[in-house]
Amino acid sequence: MYTIMAIKISPRTVAAPKVQEILTRYGCIIHTRIGLHEATENTCSTSSLILLNLTPSAEEEIKNLDNELNSLEDVTAKLLNL
């Protein structure tokens, strides 16, 4: 089984530091982290998407991570179990 979390951050510059702090605390349950945002030579997107591959057996920690992220005003987190 795979437990994937998608995290949308907008505006990225406002919410990203707090998201980073939360993800650092839960680092032991994060297998893979991929950050996506549009960037060109002259501009950088104000929103971003982070994809996490989480330890499926860490159900309580995943629930806490989800709750903490969704408590932030500019952040939306969704879980997907495959």
Residue ranges and their predicted role:
Residues 1-82:
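Long, contiguous binding/interaction regions
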